[in-house]
């Protein structure tokens, strides 16, 4: 979403958007300051449940730090209009929308919580005058077109060589494998892990996606 702001930012402060993720623990405050000192100018408060007091507290802390005054703060993930209004009221500069929409995510099944992404995006876009990031559930150009239509503005990974060909590891953000990798407790697993065939660089895919989006715009009568 922040890519659309590149021209304005490049002209005003002569650098491109550099985004980095932080959590909501005390140690993340030191991380935030270190990231900005290293060149980050957008911070994403990256938690599964963004409509939470800890997220609000982190937004407030970021907004009261002199060293972060020029830094945009994105908050998420959320799925409801009320959550968006809360985070915006505390100063969020952008929102990340999507709970349970990932193809390997099992949150909606295991917890009963979550909203279809298009519905979330449409509802939140009605009250949000900031950039919105659609997170999860974008598999085809049709999915991208729907996300764009309701208000939203490359996933690299290590290549695995096998006797059957090249693959990439694909993991849900709350999968057991991800939790183990990041040293988290092996509990509250709400995702799966798998391998998918390697399809080449994103440049070989993006043209087809762009063609699909352009076709969707023509059907919608866009000018």
What is the predicted role of each segment?
Residues 83, 89-90, 112-223:
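Alpha/beta catalytic cores of nucleotide-metabolism and tRNA/nucleoside-modifying enzymes
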Residues 1-131, 153, 213:
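Active-site entrance/lid segments in N-terminal catalytic domains of soluble metabolic enzymes
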């Amino acid at each position: 979403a922040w890519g659309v702001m590149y021209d304005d930012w490049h002209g005003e402060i002569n650098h491109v958007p550099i985004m980095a993720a932080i959590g909501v623990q005390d140690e993340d405050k030191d991380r935030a300051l270190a990231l900005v000192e290293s060149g980050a100018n957008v911070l994403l408060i990256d938690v599964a449940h963004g409509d939470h007091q800890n997220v609000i507290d982190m937004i407030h802390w970021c907004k009261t730090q002199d060293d972060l005054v020029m830094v945009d703060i994105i908050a998420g993930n959320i799925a409801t209009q009320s959550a968006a209004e809360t985070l915006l009221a505390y100063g969020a500069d952008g929102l990340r929308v999507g709970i349970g929409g990932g193809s390997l995510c099992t949150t909606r099944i295991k917890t009963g919580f979550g909203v279809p992404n298009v519905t979330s995006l449409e509802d939140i876009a009605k009250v949000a005058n900031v950039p919105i990031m659609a997170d999860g559930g974008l598999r085809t150009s049709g999915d991208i077109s729907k996300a764009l239509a309701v208000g939203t503005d490359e996933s690299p990974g290590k290549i695995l060589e096998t006797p059957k060909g090249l693959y990439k590891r694909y993991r849900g953000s709350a999968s057991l494998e991800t939790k183990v990798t990041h040293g988290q407790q092996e509990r509250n697993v709400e995702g799966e892990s798998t391998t998918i065939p390697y399809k080449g660089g994103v440049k070989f895919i993006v043209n087809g996606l762009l063609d699909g989006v352009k076709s969707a715009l023509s059907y919608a009568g866009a000018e």
